[in-house]
Structure formats: structure tokens, C-alpha cells
Design a protein with these regions (language model features):
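Acidic, metal-coordinating catalytic segment for phosphate/diphosphate chemistry
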Residues: 1-20, 25-27, 92-93
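A short, highly charged, low-complexity intrinsically disordered segment
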Residues: 4-7, 149-161
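Residue-level signal for short segments within beta-strands and strand-turn junctions
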Residues: 22-24, 35, 106-107
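Conserved Nudix-box catalytic region and its N-terminal flanking loop in Nudix hydrolases
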Residues: 27-70
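Short aromatic/basic micro-patch
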Residues: 41, 97, 123
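Active-site segment of metal-dependent pyrophosphate-handling enzymes
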Residues: 67-111
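NUDIX/MutT-family hydrolases
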Residues: 102, 106, 111-146
Length: 161
């Protein structure tokens, strides 16, 4: 868990978000990012009442990409949790501690992505280290890189040997 050292006294998140990092193997391993305004992001979103983090992640994945739970394999050995500060929408001035949970998924077969909530999407070649977005994407990809070095199953899904 990564915490912002500027405000260590706040330890209880008030905003929760959950999503997926999706990989595919085309000619080489690639991961999916969604275009969100002037930045790249993951298919993710806030939890609905009564949802688990995993249920929210799968719902958001389907809503934002058209990918369903049956079209991916979820790595049971990887969950990325990250806390950081956000300014809530709606004109609020007080920052809130957000907890982001990301699951790692692999496409079982190539499928078209149906962008419904983003300007577009892009498959990025897996060639660490990546420098895409310092607050959430880069720490996630660093964690995935460490996981891939340890997990034979995840490496085999990407045909990394």
C-alpha cells in the first residue's frame, strides 16, 4: 500500500474505486488503457452500494470496454491497492483519501473494445519501465512487472516464457 507522505495523519479512505488492468498477447504482450480527457486511465470506477471491490471492477470493465468476466482470466495472485489524495467532483474544496484496487486480467481471445465512457483506447506494448501517469498507472505497472518476474502462470499467459 502506497501512502502520500504529505498527509500521514489521515488513514481512512473515503473514496473507493476498483478496476482492471487487461493484457493481451498479439505479436507481443500489450496492456489496455482508456483515453480520459487529457490523460490515460484504466477501466475503473466507484463501488455501488453493496458491491465488493471485485464485483465493481468487473462491472466497470464491462461498462467501459464491453469485456465480460467470461472473456478474461483473472490472476488470483495479484491485487494492487494504492491510496492517494483527490479533490472530489462537484466543487468540493476538501481533499479526500482515495483507495484504488486493481485486478490483473488476461484476454482469453482477442476481442474488439467498445468504448462507452472514454474518448478511445490504446493497447500499449509491454516494455517496462513505463512512464505514463505518475500517480496511479506507473506504480501499478511497476507492481505488475515485479509480479511477472515471480509468477510462472502470469508469464505463460503473456507467452513470456
Amino acid at each position: 500500500m502506497i501512502m502520500d507522505p504529505l498527509e500521514p495523519e489521515a488513514s481512512h479512505p473515503s473514496v473507493f474505486s476498483s478496476g482492471y488492468l487487461i493484457f493481451r498477447h498479439s505479436d507481443r504482450p500489450q496492456f489496455l488503457l482508456m483515453r480520459h480527457g487529457d490523460r490515460w486511465d484504466l477501466p475503473k470506477g466507484h463501488l455501488d452500494d453493496g458491491e465488493t471491490k471485485k464485483q465493481a471492477a468487473l462491472r466497470e470493465l464491462e461498462e467501459e470496454t464491453g469485456l465480460t468476466s467470461s472473456s478474461i482470466w483473472t490472476d488470483p495472485e495479484f491485487v494492487f491497492e494504492h491510496r492517494y489524495w483527490v479533490t472530489p467532483r462537484g466543487g468540493a474544496t476538501k481533499r479526500a483519501l482515495k483507495e484504488l484496487t486493481i485486478y490483473l486480467g488476461f484476454l482469453l481471445q482477442d476481442r474488439a473494445i467498445e468504448c462507452t465512457e472514454h474518448l478511445g483506447h490504446q493497447w500499449w506494448n509491454w516494455a517496462p519501465p513505463h512512464r505514463i501517469q505518475v500517480q496511479t498507472i506507473d506504480p501499478l505497472l511497476e507492481s505488475v512487472d515485479r509480479h511477472l518476474q515471480r509468477s510462472a502462470t502470469a508469464r505463460s499467459m503473456l507467452k513470456l516464457g
